[in-house]
């Protein structure tokens, strides 16, 4: 199992020691052109997690490859995955085409970007365009909105995806004391512990549909949470919102994982893989 961060939940330039505790650092989503992002406030705490409406703020592809990536590479010894975003298939593909293979281990395609249709055929179109543009491994990152998980997973696999990441945030809204949205933009992406049941269901359904590697994320804060992701079929696990509150979360989750497995009768977490699929035979690449 590899331990990753969810894209956008960790700045390795300001907290390299946290990133070094992970097996893989996933960058913020990079788009072809620089983006300022949404107006503040764009983050709000909730009872069960947090909302964000960052708006894909990033320096743009050229500046990222020229300035940010070399700095990340100088600070980190582990794998770096680039989160790729865009507003059309060719925008994704062009960033993949420009990605320096010697500096990156994989590309995670953020298929939940604004104006991107999340229908299976649309997701597959983006993956196919990126597959034609790069030999780097491609992980398709999916949201839990408005699609059949298995159908979408099968579509992106047929289009050339090498792995699946899920889930991205749920759309949510909170109100302040004056009954106005706490975020300037209105609704935002909801994440945190309360997202875990949604994420587990998505990982479980995805594993029934594919033998590809799966990065499970959404509400993971403890070793037990990570074990549940593995039991549902995740080969790797990512930490998200917890990183904002606990910089020691990677070490803590990793240390607690096998204890959590032993608590339910497994010698280690590896033996719990797909335990939630006891009724069917599961094969994994």
Task: Give the predicted meaning of each segment.
Residues 190-210, 221-285:
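Alpha/beta catalytic cores of nucleotide-metabolism and tRNA/nucleoside-modifying enzymes
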Residues 1-4, 75-82, 133-144, 207-217:
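Short beta-strand/loop segments at the ligand-binding rim of alpha/beta enzyme cores
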Residues 50-51, 58, 111-121, 152-212:
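Glycine/Thr-rich beta-alpha phosphate-binding loop at enzyme active sites
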Residues 5, 25, 64, 82, ...:
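Conserved, mostly hydrophobic/aromatic
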Residues 1-80, 86:
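N-terminal capping/small domains of soluble enzymes
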Residues 28-32, 106-113, 163-173, 219-220, ...:
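Glycine-rich phosphate-binding active-site loops on the catalytic face of alpha/beta enzymes
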Residues 8-9, 83-87, 142-148, 167, ...:
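Glycine-rich beta-to-alpha transition loops that act as phosphate-gripper elements at the mouths
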Residues 14-19, 90-101, 146-159, 204-210, ...:
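Catalytic cores of alpha/beta
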């Amino acid at each position: 199992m590899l331990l990753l961060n969810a894209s956008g939940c960790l700045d390795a330039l300001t907290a390299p020691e946290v990133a070094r505790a992970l097996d893989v650092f996933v960058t913020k989503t990079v788009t072809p052109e620089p983006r300022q992002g949404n107006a503040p406030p764009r983050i709000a705490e909730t009872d069960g997690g947090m909302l964000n409406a960052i708006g894909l703020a990033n320096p743009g592809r050229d500046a990222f490859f020229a300035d940010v990536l070399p700095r990340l590479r100088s600070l980190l010894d582990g794998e770096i995955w680039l989160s790729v975003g865009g507003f059309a298939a060719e925008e994704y593909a062009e960033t993949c085409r420009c990605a320096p293979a010697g500096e990156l281990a994989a590309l995670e395609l953020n298929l939940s970007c604004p104006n991107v249709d999340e229908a299976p055929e649309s997701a597959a179109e983006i993956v196919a365009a990126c597959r034609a543009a790069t030999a780097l491994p491609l992980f398709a990152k999916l949201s839990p909105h408005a699609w059949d998980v298995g159908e979408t997973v099968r579509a992106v696999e047929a289009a050339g995806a090498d792995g699946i990441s899920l889930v991205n945030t749920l759309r949510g809204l909170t109100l302040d004391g004056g009954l106005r949205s706490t975020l300037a933009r209105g609704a935002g992406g909801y994440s945190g512990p309360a997202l875990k049941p949604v994420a587990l269901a998505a990982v479980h359904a995805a594993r029934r549909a594919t033998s590809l590697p799966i990065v499970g994320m959404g509400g993971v804060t403890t070793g037990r949470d990570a074990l549940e992701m593995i039991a549902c079929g995740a080969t790797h696990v990512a930490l998200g919102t917890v990183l904002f509150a606990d910089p020691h979360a990677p070490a803590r989750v990793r240390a607690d994982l096998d204890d959590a497995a032993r608590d339910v009768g497994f010698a280690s977490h590896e033996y719990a893989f797909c335990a939630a699929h006891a009724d069917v035979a599961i094969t994994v690449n």
